[in-house]
Amino acid sequence: MKSPLLGLVVWSLLLQLLQPGLAFWNSQISQNCHNGSYEITVLMMNNYAFQESLESLKTAVNKGLDIVKQRLQEAALYVTVNATFIHSDGLIHKSGDCRSSTCEGLDLLREIARQKRMGCALMGPSCTYSTYQMYLDTELNYPMISAGSFGLSCDHKETLTRMMSPARKLMYFLVDFWKASNLPFKSFSWNTSYVFKNGTESEHCFWYINALEAGVSYFSQVLGFKEMLRGNEELQKILKDPNRRSNVIVMCGTPQTMESLKIDWTATEDTVIILVDLFNNYYLEENATAPDYMKNVLVLTLPPGNSTINTSLSKESLQEFSDFALAYLDGILLFGHMLKTFLRNGENTTAHKFAHAFRNLTFEGSTGPVTLDDSGDIDNTMVLLYTSVDTKKFKPLLFYDTRINQTTPIDTHPTFIWKNHRLPHDIPGLGPHILLIAVCTLAGVVVLILLIALLVLRKYKKDNELRQKKWSHIPPEKILPLETNEANHVSLKIDDDKKRDTVQRLRQCKYDPKRAILKDLKYSDGNFSEKQKIELDKLLPSDFYSLTKFYGTVKLDTRIFGVIEYCERGSLREVLNETISYPDGTIMGWEFKISVLYDIAKGMSYLHSSKIEVHGRLKSTNCVVDSRMVVKITDFGYNSILPPKKDLWTAPEHLRQASTSQKGDVYSFGIIAQEIIMRRETFYTLSCRDQKEKIFRVEHPDGLKPFRPDLFLETAEEKELEVFLLVKNCWEEDPEKRPDFKKIENTLAKIFGLFHDQKNESYMDTLIRRLQLYSRNLEHLVEERTQLYKAERDRADRLNFMLLPRPVVQSLKEKGIVEPELYEEVTVYFSDIVGFTTICKYSTPMEVVDMLNDLYKSFDQIVDHHDVHKVETIGDAYVVASGLPTRNGNRHAIDISKMALDILSFIGTFELEHLPGLPVWIRIGVHSGPCAAGVVGIKIPRYCLFGDTVNTASRMESTGLPLRIHMSSSTIAILKRVQCQFLYEMRGETYLKGKGTETTYCLTGMKDQEYNLPTPPTVENQQRLQAEFSDMITNSLQKRQATGIKSRKPARVASYKKGTLEYLQLNTTDQDSTYF
């Protein structure tokens, strides 16, 4: 069965892709709604279901604008009011079908956003699909007026106004008419019905019948029996069936619909058909006659409106418009009425108040006064017509005012086709027979006598049980502690300590000879009141598979405990938190979730029908899971002993006044259901995380929509929506609108059939299937843990390889130690940033961290392409060595030289984000010689280098020049020895601290490869160089201020937007170094 709810879900996913555009569109609300010029945007879509041309709708809108302008002038308000028509060209969206209107609506929304043509309000769309998605995903902050949108999904939307009767109003009438038993022509209340659906209904009929079909709708919840008839074949079969379960059939259509069915009324004289045909003025015309096939039909329609007081709209001019076009016209008049009201009061028409003001009001429409209820839906008076057997005409039977939900009979002596001119009973074969009345009276007398006798016997039995003290019959010596091997249980959970602590607090014990839980009743003397004794006595006989067994009470030391059945898998809350043992993909699938909800509903249904009557503290921690994966309810029946608490599961009426009720348990079930479905924290909502604030907002609602958890309907599939709607019904603000657990149980049983094909499966089969699922999951979990261990081992290896050289890590893994080693010849590279202190002076600490991180990440990438080892970074210094820990002959000098050239080439292209235009200068020093290396320390071990070679390389860097590679003569000698084609120039004699004066060189490139090296600064004097660099920084800061470049936010540690952030990317800085 295809449901329109599926369309809503599919299109909501599509709409997520357009959120940026819609957000922009949402920001244009005040574009054409101020300074004396006010526009209404009219969204016109090709919907053939209404059989109305766009030109006719434009004519109706323009007619409404003329009236609005006239009324504003009469009120001395001289402003400009216009309409902007938005519609597609019909080239792409050709179907004109309501189900495909969402795509067309999205295109029109983008057109509005692109052209910035949004006015004060939006008129349209008319289809429930597009209206629901626009309201759901765009967070409308302006009034939206719709001529249509009949479906239940558009009910109670804060800024949506509907100008045609929605399905909700129809259901109110049907329920009131079904329950009426004191009308002159109806002596029985009805509780059954068939609903006919042939799949060819008009737009409004489609949504009316769909609402009656929904299992969670008001109509379905109230009726004891309801069945859908799909197609003429099923209808004819039911009409001819003498054992049918109802005489009443609801359908939507026209007299032509009835004629096409070709019903044989001679075989169905007790049948009553309610034909919903609201938008058809044919029945009340003077020359209208009722065909013979309408004699068993009651027609529900809307009477023609009263003549308008506006001389600009005559009856003749209104006849050219259909009800759909008149709804557009009335929408324009409503906009004009609200505009006049706000302008008179000097209020802002773009404010939040204007968007929520289109409700609870009456204005002058095209055919008379129009009233809107507190949800923004139109109220009107429906009329129920019948066919007179005398005149063969349609006559009014009753009026129904949707504003006050009141039925007013018009014809007290109708000339019906039915027997005695009264409507028949809804169940075939029932009626006011004298014999039946006599039997019922006699049975009532007998029942009354038996009831009196039962009450006397019950009172005697109760007093006798209280005297025997059955509620505290367990001697303390029968409560035994658990043995050691029983207390220690194997678990696959990694962090199981918390769970074991929770179990210990519950005081596990052994009783006859089962495991049990001791429930602290918080009484020290054991002197219960008579009410409390009665309450405890009711718990003993309760024995149901979805309830934990209560064994009695016991006094240990000075405290009283209840002895309750133990369930091995803990509470439902713990199971939901355990995502490893109970993953979503296998065990905790939708079928299992529905089964869990059914277990709870089954247990609560039994509990409510038992002597216990009410739970009072139903929550996910009071639902436990046994070894067979059956959910049981516990902690019930102590309402007079344990005072009620204000919890997230507590119903709002009980938060305001501490008490308990069955409807309050239904609310608690709704909160538990949301926990199970979402598998999140209790009462999960994105708008609030504080528990006390949640409880306060539930207890004190601040608007029409009460505060409830999030359900994320837009991501739900078709079958899941039935569950979501049931949950929403369970946490209704009005307790009377919540279903009882019997209805919840039946609804879940039907929903379970949608998820599970084996509908005739026994309870034992279901139980075995659950255990098989759990067993397969354990096997999968063991395999997954093995893979997880291997992945963690490999990740630890990768981390070690980032901290230490690979040979060093291998030695540590194999031997546990790393022997220090002396290397005859290695090449060490040092570099640091010129003017780093000056840059820090003009930068924030976070900007300095960002600068070093961006620079050294790029250095690390260059290092990966050469046979070198990064030793460490010390502040702005970067240290690299080659030739260790793996010796590479004379290649160490070649690799360091090539790496230095690559780094210097990169520096020429690097630019600081917070100081645009400022060049980054580095000094590079390289030296070759012997060196010792080894791992130092146990905690945060370091692979350190020792020797004069390291110090000399550092001196080469500190005495070098900006943007130059300063090399010692030993490195140049190695390069000459291997005959590599490196280009270098002699710098001359350079003084090195601790070594004296030596001849040094500058590496400038290679003969067979071009490097784009930056041009070094020409200033030789150090002081002039520093002054020039300071001027550059000052100019860069002025440039940043002039162009409005903002620095990075200092709230974070560093920016990693140029690369993937992984915990393997480490950056450590030591205060002291072993090299100096």
From Swiss-Prot:
Major location category of this protein: membrane
Record PROSITE patterns: GUANYLATE_CYCLASE_1 (PS00452), GUANYLATE_CYCLASE_2 (PS50125), PROTEIN_KINASE_DOM (PS50011)
Role this protein plays: Guanylyl cyclase that catalyzes synthesis of cyclic GMP (cGMP) from GTP.
Coiled coil: none
PTM per Swiss-Prot/TrEMBL: Glycosylation at Asn-62 is required for interaction with VIP36 while glycosylation at Asn-348 and Asn-405 modulates ligand-mediated GC-C activation.
Species of origin: Cavia porcellus (Guinea pig)
Topology within the bilayer: Single-pass type I membrane protein
GO biological process terms, semicolon-separated: intracellular signal transduction; receptor guanylyl cyclase signaling pathway
Signal peptide positions (record): 1-23
Name by which UniProt lists this protein: Guanylyl cyclase C
Residue ranges annotated for the Protein kinase domain, each copy included: 492-752
Enzyme Commission numbers on file: 4.6.1.2
Self-association and partners: Homotrimer. Interacts via its C-terminal region with NHERF4. Interacts with the lectin chaperone VIP36.
Alphabetized SMART domains for the sequence: CYCc
Keyword Glycosyltransferase found: no
Domain comment (free text): The protein kinase domain is predicted to be catalytically inactive.
Entry GO terms, CC: endoplasmic reticulum membrane; plasma membrane
Residues with glycosylation annotation: 35, 82, 191, 198, 287, 306, 310, 348, 405
A GO MF term: peptide receptor activity
